[in-house]
Amino acid sequence: MAAAFASRLTRGGRSLLGGLNNGGSMNSSNGMMNESILSQQQQRRTFIQMGTVLKVVDNSGAKKVMCIQALKGKKGARLGDTIVASVKEAMPNGKVKKGAVVYGVVVRAAMQRGRVDGSEVRFDDNAVVLVDSKDKNTKTDRQPIGTRVFGPVPHELRKKKHLKILALAQHVA
């Protein structure tokens, strides 16, 4: 794959990836590092989609979750969207266990999002707050599983009706 990608980005026999030639062989030891940095930068600025690992920023007991699906039929999730996730790391005495399928609200995303005043909000990591599954009989929104939310959360959650998360948050950005 790297050879096909590099062959499209060559200019006069010199690769823009810094060391990969048209044959796919390495010219320098720095070429593979440049390719991995390029792929990391591209991954960090995309939607939260299937396979994305997110940090859990509440005290529900989970540490890391992996996104299974973004709800509402979207191709990916952004700030304030609800996702279905699988718990990958958990505390031994937490409310949720490893391997459990949970719902979560995205409270921090590395992909930038424009605000009405022209500014843009972007966070350093992708983070989620776990919420309970909504019953069909109740008409209330999903409530957080934990009782504390760590770190900043954007005020755009107010538009998405996640007021309980805003009330539990330490800092609203």
UniProtKB/Swiss-Prot annotation:
This is Large ribosomal subunit protein uL14mz. It comes from the Eukaryota. It comes from Arabidopsis thaliana (Mouse-ear cress). It is found in: Mitochondrion. Keywords: Mitochondrion, Ribonucleoprotein, Ribosomal protein, RNA-binding, rRNA-binding, Transit peptide. Binds to 23S rRNA in mitochondrion. Mostly expressed in leaves and inflorescences, including floral organs and meristems, and, to a lower extent, in pistils. GO terms for biological process: translation.
